[in-house]
């Protein structure tokens, strides 16, 4: 493994409609088989529905939903003297967003609604109201970290 320098993270282009890098990242996470225009259509349609339900702008509503799913701590496995401990660690800001977006998309895909846009809109609405599968996932991760607080001194 080369040890010369740390490669910085690539800059992604902001999405064309709202000019948000966060939304562009979300579209990229939702995208399947390189079909970006399809993913954009789904996201924009879902955001429109979300904005109508919440009475806020599309970006504000999306930000609120994302904020309610972002984890602050997670557990990482750490091997110490033949046994593995789940050590709670703080989540870096970039990873917080990535995990939240991934969980929202996963939860939306598992829903039983008709179209993906509707599934995504419903999941984002639930996330904005602090309920739903994605929020439950965050609660589970936080609970796991809380339960393993005793191993926090094994941080690296």
Curated annotation (Swiss-Prot):
Protein's GO biological process: translation
Pfam families: Ribosomal_S7 (PF00177)
An example Gene Ontology molecular-function term: tRNA binding
GO cellular component: small ribosomal subunit
Cross-referenced CDD domains: uS7_Bacteria
InterPro entries, sorted: Ribosomal_uS7, Ribosomal_uS7_bac/org-type, Ribosomal_uS7_CS, Ribosomal_uS7_dom, Ribosomal_uS7_dom_sf
Keywords, sorted A to Z: Ribonucleoprotein, Ribosomal protein, RNA-binding, rRNA-binding, tRNA-binding
Keyword Ribonucleoprotein found: yes
PANTHER family in UniProt: RIBOSOMAL PROTEIN S7
Family stated for the protein in its record: Belongs to the universal ribosomal protein uS7 family.
Protein role: One of the primary rRNA binding proteins, it binds directly to 16S rRNA where it nucleates assembly of the head domain of the 30S subunit. Is located at the subunit interface close to the decoding center, probably blocks exit of the E-site tRNA.
Subunit structure: Part of the 30S ribosomal subunit. Contacts proteins S9 and S11.
Protein name: Small ribosomal subunit protein uS7
Organism from which the protein derives: Klebsiella pneumoniae subsp. pneumoniae (strain ATCC 700721 / MGH 78578)
Gene that encodes it: rpsG
